[in-house]
Regions:
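P-loop NTP-binding core
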Residues: 1-226
Length: 226
């Protein structure tokens, strides 16, 4: 989003989590960056990988991120936690802190194969640290409808998981413009607003927001019935 030298930032997610681990007082909003496209960001860098080693021996190690986010989340409509494609302590912290999960899966063989392991991890998190964790759905990304590999992978995902996990109608296509975005410091909407991939992300956002409104209505009806 335009902050190119993340290593020079005085405050990152690493500092926030480290303060929670040491039970130090902190201003939870210090260091949160505000982007011109109306998004706030808690930045991260490679130091987070080093902190992951410390989390292994921390007290309540799976709940460190949850404890930090509890201090800021009421100021936002949505908090998105963008996880690395790994199942380490940082990802376990994210799953423990989250209300629900959206699983992006590249329409390729190896990423799709990792679904079973991820679902097993989510099941363990539900059992031990976050019983209310829900899976909102699977988002298919880097979809190249011209290749047989992409078509067969999408079909396999729908066949193996579609009966128990929602697969979003919207798919994110392969696009050169999407690959260029991170180097430009802009979102796809600002960089190429009329592209196929920006339209796909907009359609996906509408799906997610519609789901959220439906959940709110169901919750309200359940509360009214009590």
């Amino acid at each position: 989003l335009g902050w190119r030298d993340s290593d020079s930032l005085p405050q990152t997610l690493t500092n926030k989590l480290a303060a929670v681990m040491r039970e130090e007082s902190q201003d939870p909003f210090a260091g949160i960056l505000s982007h011109e496209e109306k998004v706030d960001l808690v930045p991260s860098n490679l130091e987070l990988s080093a902190l992951e080693m410390s989390l292994v021996t921390a007290m309540s190690r799976e709940s460190v991120m949850k404890n930090y986010l509890s201090q800021v989340k009421d100021n936002y409509d949505y908090v998105l936690i963008d996880c690395m494609p790994s199942l380490g302590m940082i990802t376990l912290n994210a799953l423990t802190a989250a209300d629900s999960v959206i699983i992006p899966v590249q329409a390729q063989y190896l990423p799709a194969k990792g679904m079973t392991q991820l679902l097993s991890t989510i099941a363990k998190v539900k059992k031990h640290t976050n019983p209310n964790l829900a899976i909102d759905g699977i988002l298919l990304t880097l979809v190249d409808g011209r290749t047989n590999l992409a078509k067969s992978t999408v079909e396999a995902l729908r066949e193996n998981f579609g009966c128990r996990i929602r697969i979003y109608r919207t798919t994110i296509p392969v696009a050169v413009k999407a690959a260029e975005v991170s180097s430009k410091g802009k979102s796809i909407y600002a960089y190429e607003p009329n592209s196929t991939v920006s339209k796909a992300y907009a359609d996906f956002t509408k799906e997610v927001l519609a789901d959220g409104r439906q959940k709110e209505r169901l919750h309200a009806s359940h509360e009214h019935a009590r």
